[in-house]
């Protein structure tokens, strides 16, 4: 364990899920180094623990290849400013949390300046653009992976990697309490609810709010007594979703909640959601789900040429087989979504729940503590390439 009186960590988290991971890692590091300083880009959870943000996290919350291109000048400015600030700071370690297209380039520059670098959350190199592993090898001293199959990929390419498990698997109980979640959200204890999660980013809602709202109308025809509840990450996303609801289903009642996505999923009987980290959360909460996603046509065509896998959602990737339905791009239509939700709500969920329980146990490793131990071991290491 490092003997320095004050360790300094530079960190960059690119979105909500990164803020959660960053806060967990900070809390674990603060157990042994209560005076540690944390600087870079973080969200509200990290800032609540004393993180010093040089830029707002929203600057990095961009989805899709085409969408990134439109913001490229600003992103490059942010990165060059960070390189200057962090190089002057000379931290004991830089930790890039997810956001690989931004962070790996940053890590490459910082490592060249003699700063130890960690990338927390492996990019999906096993799924698409596998040659990125060579850049990752040059950019980082260590990768912290959340998923067990990722470490095998890094070991094969002789890139230092530690499997730490997933903080969500640590945080979410093995059996979630539907009744308590409904009480907290003031939902009817006896009604059937479908949770609708169209994503946390503006670009996601732009693509998904309309098909999700239209699908809800069709689902209401199949299940007249069903109710809908939607968590929105902030007021801006709520307004965006309300606009879609007003335009496409003005008479449909959807109960909206700011934040509390985990509680909303726990309160629900089924979940319709965007592909991403939320699918892992839904799996750990153990509810029937339908995963859907859509990006701009150009982004999709570019991504399709680089894909190495034919599954997208984390439950299916972890299981190594199709356990939840995925409706991607051209299949992300109101009709197909509604049909898939109908099937999931009517089927025997017991075998799928058993698989979710197995995967939950596999990922439950006290991730933040393991990540902190790996980072501190790197800080203490003398001979690091």
From Swiss-Prot:
Entry function: Condensation of UDP-2,3-diacylglucosamine and 2,3-diacylglucosamine-1-phosphate to form lipid A disaccharide, a precursor of lipid A, a phosphorylated glycolipid that anchors the lipopolysaccharide to the outer membrane of the cell.
Name the UniProt record assigns to this protein: Lipid-A-disaccharide synthase
Statement: the UniProt record of this protein carries the keyword Transport: no
Gene name of this polypeptide: lpxB
Family, as annotated: Belongs to the LpxB family.
Alphabetized InterPro entries for the sequence: Glyco_trans_19
Catalyses which reaction(s): a lipid X + a UDP-2-N,3-O-bis[(3R)-3-hydroxyacyl]-alpha-D-glucosamine = a lipid A disaccharide + UDP + H(+)
Alphabetized GO MF terms: lipid-A-disaccharide synthase activity; phospholipid binding
GO cellular component, one term: membrane
PANTHER family referenced in this protein's UniProt entry, alphabetically: LIPID-A-DISACCHARIDE SYNTHASE, LIPID-A-DISACCHARIDE SYNTHASE, MITOCHONDRIAL-RELATED
One example of a Gene Ontology biological process annotation: lipid A biosynthetic process
Keywords: Glycosyltransferase, Lipid A biosynthesis, Lipid biosynthesis, Lipid metabolism, Transferase
Enzyme Commission number(s): 2.4.1.182
UniProt entry tagged with the keyword Metal-binding: no
Pathway linked to the protein: Bacterial outer membrane biogenesis; LPS lipid A biosynthesis
Organism: Shewanella sp. (strain MR-4)
